[in-house]
């Protein structure tokens, strides 16, 4: 069971140069992701003179976030694992794949990366960074469930393509698959919650714009979804014994 593998870690681990380097990698990767993702939204609003939301805007957000996450995960993969997301880090912790203290270093770095990216966007664009919020008519309950489900799909994909020791050559496409699932989920949930799936992505714009309406949804949903995905995949597909089905010649 993964619960046996969950570890707090030691202060020495949290301050070890390798951990600090990994934290810096998470900071840079999250900075890249938020700057490109949120920046694309600001650019679209400028081109449309802050017009009403349109399907084209949703598609552009989906593509921008998918591409940016593909790059962000790729550049951090060999150093920190390329989490770029507190929900991914929490899912890895629940599955016993990262210690609590190392995970805290990651999450702090991710949050700082998002804040710096958001603040820099305000400076270079002279525009506000849109904070995540629920669309009109969307209740807190459905929004929470939507964020849980979308993040479950994201972290499950991370486990299947990047964490599973049996992944084999599929690990090569992990950053692409992770970017694709985020892009697809934005097409699903973007019109309702903004499709965060990532507390860091929501946190930076909230700090810079100082807008906290229903902000807890963007923490609770992703952390619950990520934790469930990590637990399910670790218990059912990594720690359980599995024998390949016999092949039959016809």
UniProtKB/Swiss-Prot annotation:
Keyword vocabulary terms for this entry: Membrane, Repeat, Transmembrane, Transmembrane helix, Transport
Transmembrane stretches, start-end: 22-42, 56-76, 104-124, 138-158, 170-190, 218-238
Subcellular location(s) of the protein: Membrane
Keyword Isomerase carried by entry: no
Chief localisation class: membrane
A GO MF label: channel activity
GO terms for cellular component: membrane
Protein topology in the membrane: Multi-pass membrane protein
Motif extent (NPA 1): 85-87
Motif annotated as NPA 2, chain positions: 198-200
Top-level taxon of the source organism: Eukaryota
Free-text comment on this protein's domains from its UniProt entry: Aquaporins contain two tandem repeats each containing three membrane-spanning domains and a pore-forming loop with the signature motif Asn-Pro-Ala (NPA).
Function description: Aquaporins facilitate the transport of water and small neutral solutes across cell membranes. May have a role in buffering osmotic fluctations in the highly compartmented vacuole of arbuscule cells.
Family (UniProt): Belongs to the MIP/aquaporin (TC 1.A.8) family. TIP (TC 1.A.8.10) subfamily.
Name listed for the protein in its UniProt record: Probable aquaporin TIP-type
